[in-house]
Amino acid sequence: MCRKVCTFAHQKENCAISFAINNDMENSFNACIEESIKKYWNFDALTDYKGVTLQYQDVARKIEKLHILFEESGIQKGDKIALCGRNMSNWAVAFLATLTYGAVAVPILHEFTADQVHNIVNHSEAKLLFVGDVVSTQIDPEKMPDILGIVNIPDYSLMISRTEKLTYARENLNLLFGQKYPKYFRKEMVNYYKEQNPDELALINYTSGTTGFSKGVMIPYRAMWSNLIFANGALDKHLHPGDNTISILPMAHMYGMAFEFIQEFATGCHIFFLTRIPSPAVVAQAFAEIKPVIIIAVPLVIEKIIRKKVLPKLDTPAMKILLKTPFVSQKVRDKIRDEVYKAFGGRFYEIIIGGAAFNQEIEQFLHFIGFPFTVGYGATECAPIISYNDWHDHVPGSCGKAAVNMEVKIDPVNPRKIPGEILTRGMNVMLGYFKNEEATKQALDDEGWYHTGDLGVIDAWGNIFIKGRSKNMLLGASGQNIFPEEIEDALNSLPLVVESIVVQREDKLVGLVYPDFDEAKAQNLSMDQIKKAMEQNRLTLNATQPAYCKLAAIEIHEEEFEKTPKKSIKRYLYK
């Protein structure tokens, strides 16, 4: 990976890490991508699991062709290009092509509904939209009137073109490439756009797609660059050119993008994309075959594999006795650890877990057997890293210490005893929310602190312990941001619903509803009929929601929810 040119001075101060940097961006983010492609030209780069492999030189050619497509169709530096589809090599190439051309990428979760995709494309002012197979069948181009065209990610064919320039460029792309490079295309010819200053906008990552709730997080190049510096420092000794890695998390999510794709690509690794739904069986098979050297995951992936492949073997009377026998216990634990290690491919240095809360039972079990894992903490607004510790230094229950270039503090000040809001600032922090000054002012204060909305404490050694969320946002099993108010807003508009709360129970969402009993009485409805009506409401609601926002059940409350003087429901009373 390209080496950092920034210089840093770290010091512990009030349980935070301060930083000072030299803003010389000569070795910029896009320069890192360019250097990686040139340096690892003949290395395997990207593989769609069970599919075709692209070498770094193949990636360079595809990027160059997309640059020609952008230029010939009139895309300017700073224009927005949206991408919405499952993880695959061509998604990664299109993303890199966007940034290295000088355009702004707008990654969109493929799980968003069609209306959410339309809203994001329109709100972001995107000029082009790249879509995957499934997304292409769901969206309506007429609801995105300002885009020049839609490009199919699997083969870069045009789904729709609204300009002659775009149509001509795509139909003659190979010819145009041949005219620009009549003899050959070599690595010496790769010359990408370099960002002009650290605060230049690199991408906009939306936390939600619903009109009225959309927040497009503006990620500058300094944040992308700083996350690379962090990852290089944390993993440089364990991640090497040619190593196999797996991309499971959505690349449209900052966690998956930064640490399952960009870091590995900059290091010269061979990245395998799981193009199918990452079920426990598919993931376990991929781990066994690919044998990744670093595993980045959300808790659910780890928990399901352990619960399915490991814990059943331990739930026997004989094993329980052995684990309690002092002179046998350590040998048994070592054997169990080896089995768990094999379940994840058997070659990795550590598993880094983040994106959602980790199950305490599983975390305690992994510590008990001495398994190499750690838990990090981040946010989309920090692109994403806030804190991390190597697994050797991981403190149970914590999510590490402030990452390089970042400060963390607790407000109000009594960080070691009383939980307060976690605040962070540094190079990783966003510029703000796109076209949303009010939300930006609420999230970023005048001193540059990002207010996370999370409650926590910091111990004497700087380890951060999250105690809860002051915001109402929930986290899906794969780290998706879930805003209950949006679901409640839709639920409250359905028949017989007066008010509702959406709560999370393990990885399931449940709607708590206070029905309109007066209306039910007027219709002579029994309680059984009200329950049937609520089940129909659940089905109706789920048809409009992405998979991770669907309700598993609706529970009826026979009394109104308790409220504050401002008539807000006291959410903390309901679980």
Region locations from a protein language model:
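Conserved pre-ATP/AMP-binding loop-to-beta segment of ANL
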Residues: 41-42, 170-206, 213, 238-244
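Conserved AMP-binding/adenylation subdomain of ANL enzymes
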Residues: 225-244, 252-338, 347, 372
